[in-house]
């Protein structure tokens, strides 16, 4: 029976690596997965999912106006799809998360979503909020803070490495702009 999974973590826990490994596992068994990623994240090229360890794959793009159910149903009609993999799923809208539940419930295709739980202010992203509510399985991927404890928060920094306390929720960046830390070091960095 198909289910929807939400694999979440702070940055640098290996979400994209895990997604690419899952895709490989399906392909190795002669199955056809489909990878989607957010159009606004083009750090590694448009329509690419890349991991820090060098793995990469082409991906379909989703934008705020993409109807994921219709797009996946059309792909599935042409060729059977065995799994849908969504990278950067925190950028999904509430409606798109609902569309993915329809993929699971009507098309009977498993959907595996990978993304951040919260932003640099500790607030849930819209996509993450509804994945936490509607996913069948929640899986936390772990990374570590510089102190050795589990990192579950993300700090956005300026060009001098100083924590930023306000700004737009979405600002694409990697290790140059974001640091994963434990809650204690998050609060210390923001002066809370």
From Swiss-Prot:
Q: Where is the active site?
A: 88 (proton acceptor)
Q: What is its EC number?
A: 2.7.1.21
Taking the first listed entry, what is the main subcellular location of this protein, grouped into a coarse class? cytoplasm
Annotated binding of ATP, by residue? 9-16, 87-90
Q: Would I find Kinase among this entry's keywords?
A: yes
> What is the reaction catalyzed?
thymidine + ATP = dTMP + ADP + H(+)
Query: What keywords are assigned to this protein?
Result: ATP-binding, Cytoplasm, DNA synthesis, Kinase, Metal-binding, Nucleotide-binding, Transferase, Zinc
- Compartment(s) of residence: Cytoplasm
> Quick check: keyword ATP-binding in the entry?
yes
Quote the InterPro entries the UniProt record gives. P-loop_NTPase, Thymidine_kinase, Thymidine_kinase_CS
Q: Which domain of life is it from?
A: Bacteria
GO term, biological process aspect, one: thymidine metabolic process
Q: What Gene Ontology terms describe where this protein resides (cellular component)?
A: cytosol
- Annotated residues for binding of Zn(2+): 145, 147, 182, 185
Instruction: Name a GO molecular-function annotation.
Output: ATP binding
The record's family statement is: Belongs to the thymidine kinase family.
How this chain assembles, per its entry, is: Homotetramer.
Q: Please report the name of this protein according to its UniProt entry.
A: Thymidine kinase
Q: Which organism is it from?
A: Vibrio parahaemolyticus serotype O3:K6 (strain RIMD 2210633)
